[in-house]
């Protein structure tokens, strides 16, 4: 059972990611997201040749248009507020500072909440996407927790005493850009740097690593469960096949994955040692596709690194997976909107 707060009014909720834009509704007095529409984001992934500012304009036009279409649906009451989760660092007052997966390089700071309010004529709540995802679990987690998304990149947020632990200017919760490999030829990060945690322990980074391992050790690769689906071609290995092989116990796949997860274990150990958070929830397509295998291998590495003062049982017990769906940001931004707009009570719903 997951405790969720019902919406105080009819809401349109949106999750703007680098790959997909999701827009849905939450009916007043409920917490369930329905009528979800998913469309490819009109950003860097589709129009990479365009300049960053042009991409930002294109993304905002699409976001505004799709939200407007959800405000008044046949047979439904008009929505009275909007809540948006956004893939990029954001200030406390809703200004997006960057959009690496949306428009790439530098563009003008984007006051997304103000822009949407002006365009739509409704109150707008906006937050970073990982902040939104963390709010999904806020009512269900009585102790401070760190939510980390492991998908094409890595991001995190710490939720403590009813609030996300970030600076007013949006700094914090970006462990994906923590430098863990100082080599000049370290894996490239989408931000333009190299050797960042998100370039190594993410789904994209782990795939890069297993392909490199396959190319470097042809005989071990040939004996692996990955050889068949890829036709023996390292560059043809997919994340889906990699996750399936690791779950099935394939030694080659699991050892490559273990190496990729080592710096993530170091990040968890550092967070625990620095601020004492003892609950770590993991979401994101790559982590959830691996399931218990992700927790087992990450736990192995975390025990090896160590968490000062904790034994093996207590160390492994800190790690858990979030709900196995792609609605974390939609549900979470609805929860944040309920907290900010005001809601009288919490209800229990089946996860």
From Swiss-Prot:
<dbReference type="InterPro" id="IPR043129">
    <property type="entry name" value="ATPase_NBD"/>
</dbReference>
<keyword id="KW-0045">Antibiotic biosynthesis</keyword>
<dbReference type="GO" id="GO:0017000">
    <property type="term" value="P:antibiotic biosynthetic process"/>
</dbReference>
<protein>
    <recommendedName>
        <fullName>C(7)-cyclitol 7-kinase</fullName>
        <ecNumber>2.7.1.214</ecNumber>
    </recommendedName>
</protein>
<keyword id="KW-0808">Transferase</keyword>
<dbReference type="InterPro" id="IPR000600">
    <property type="entry name" value="ROK"/>
</dbReference>
<dbReference type="GO" id="GO:0016301">
    <property type="term" value="F:kinase activity"/>
</dbReference>
<comment type="similarity">
    <text>Belongs to the ROK (NagC/XylR) family.</text>
</comment>
<comment type="function">
    <text>Involved in the biosynthesis of the antifungal agent validamycin A. Catalyzes the phosphorylation of valienone and validone to their 7-phosphate derivatives.</text>
</comment>
<keyword id="KW-0418">Kinase</keyword>
<dbReference type="Pfam" id="PF00480">
    <property type="entry name" value="ROK"/>
</dbReference>
């Amino acid at each position: 059972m997951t405790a969720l707060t019902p919406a105080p009014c009819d809401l349109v909720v949106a999750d703007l990611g680098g790959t997909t834009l999701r827009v849905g509704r939450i009916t007043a007095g409920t917490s369930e997201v329905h009528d979800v529409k998913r469309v490819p984001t009109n950003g860097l992934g589709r129009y990479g040749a365009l300049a960053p500012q042009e991409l930002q304009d294109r993304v905002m036009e699409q976001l505004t248009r799709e939200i407007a279409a959800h405000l008044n649906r046949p047979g439904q009451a008009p929505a009275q507020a909007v809540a948006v989760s956004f893939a990029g660092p954001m200030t406390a007052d809703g200004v997006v500072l960057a959009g690496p997966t949306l428009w790439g390089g530098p563009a003008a700071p984007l006051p997304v909440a103000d822009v949407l309010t002006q365009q739509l004529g409704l109150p707008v709540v906006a937050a970073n996407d990982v902040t939104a995802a963390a709010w999904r679990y806020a009512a269900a987690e009585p102790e401070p927790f760190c939510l980390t998304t492991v998908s094409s990149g890595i991001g995190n947020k710490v939720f403590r005493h009813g609030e996300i632990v970030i600076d007013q200017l949006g700094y914090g919760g970006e462990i994906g850009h923590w430098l863990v490999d100082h080599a000049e030829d370290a894996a490239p990060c989408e931000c333009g740097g190299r050797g960042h945690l998100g370039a190594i322990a993410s789904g994209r980074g782990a795939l890069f690593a297993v392909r490199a391992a396959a190319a470097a050790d042809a005989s071990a690769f040939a004996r692996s469960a990955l050889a068949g689906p890829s036709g023996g071609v390292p560059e043809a290995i997919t994340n889906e096949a990699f996750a399936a092989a690791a779950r099935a116990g394939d030694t080659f796949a699991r050892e490559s994955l273990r190496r990729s997860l080592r710096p993530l274990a170091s990040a968890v150990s550092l967070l625990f040692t620095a601020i004492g958070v003892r609950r770590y929830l993991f979401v994101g397509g790559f982590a959830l596709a691996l399931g218990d295998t992700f927790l087992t291998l990450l736990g192995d590495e975390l025990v090896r690194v160590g968490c000062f003062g904790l034994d093996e049982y207590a160390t492994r017990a800190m790690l858990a997976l979030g709900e196995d769906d792609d609605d974390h940001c939609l549900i979470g931004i609805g929860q944040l909107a309920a907290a900010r707009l005001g809601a009288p009570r919490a209800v229990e719903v089946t996860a």
